[in-house]
Amino acid sequence: MPTTIGRGISNIMRHGTANFGITGTDWQEKINWDRLRTYRLESARARMKAHGLGAMLCMYDENCRYITSTLTPGWNRLKPGLRYALLCGDAAPVLFEQGDIGAQIARHSPWIPEENIRYSYAWIKGAAGGASEQQVTKFTNAIVEEMKRFGVAGEKLGVDFIDINMIGAFEKAGIEWVDGMSAMMEARSIKNVDEQECMRIVAAIGDAAHWETMKFLKPGRTENQVTAHIMQFLFNIPGLEDVEDVIVSSGPNTWPNWRNFTARIIQPGDIVFMDLAALTWNGYKSCYYRTYCVGKEPTQEMNDTYEQALGWLYDSIEAVKVGTTTKEIASKWPSAKEAWGYEEEDQAAANLWGHGLGLAQYDPPVISRIWSLDHPIEIKEGMVFALETQHGKTYQYGVRIEEMLIVHNDEVEIISNFPVEKITVVDPM
């Protein structure tokens, strides 16, 4: 049904909730994981072909997972080359796993053909020192052999990561490498019904974490204690794989918002905001801010500031619909100069912001006045993204609010359900 939150809301919005639980049963289909895996693989393949690529080399965690549906452990992340995947033509993906871990892949992920499980050749971004050239040569030769095996040798190879070692080795091997990240971004931007349900569950976990934050906050706690408590809360949830950050900022740390936490003691009357920056459930990630006032009622000035930020947020949500563009959304926000007196939009980067959510915290579209006004991206059915706004008074207080949403053909589904209409007041005196 239509919402009345914010100012000037006229389009159809609804709040959506998770449809199913997070554990498996024999009497409910819930999320169809096989359908999800097939959708992701074939979406990547379709975009690969649309870009004229014979093969796609995926070294970033989110892309490797998208095409193989295998897990990158925490110690392995942000180290392109420890594990990677290759998609060639119409073939099943080839997974290059570190060492003998491939034996576990064969057991846990049987949709990867056993003959397509290989061991990787890593140089760890050059940390192998003088051995890097040796390793990248072996790496390159293995890629060439797989492209030959699947009949795409000599065709363009899309890559989502490149470094100086790879450039030289690819040139020697005669590999024509081109941008492959754009194709993967396009594929990841549209979520099927199963991915959408994953995101509803992610948001439901976020709702619970904010409720737990509300109960745990009190004067005398420190920011890092709140972060630690919510981390522990989250990692007790089945299917929870990772939390990139639980941002907790209080008092003068809230403006400018430095997106961090410290050992600062929270005091009566402090504004505190918490962001679930990429809690990760079965690979899918959140971004979810809420603002609290601890120990006292917020001042009228604080409430007015919050109302301004809330208006900016819901004005931008109102602009979301299939067929419009990121320009129309970003245009709902004031310029950096109008809002804060900055001379350039980049000075306010991420203050008024939108970004896709999925296997990465930054799937398309990414929305900002920095680029969206001149480089608009069309909003499509199946996109899942967050919109977030903030405002404040330097070194005194700041507020930040964020909603996660799914774009449907005829409506916008808001999946973050912790109350947002006003600052959440915790234990006022």
Task: Please report, for each region that a protein language model flagged, where it lies by residue.
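Active-site neighborhoods and metal-handling regions in enzymes and metal-associated proteins
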Residues: 1-429
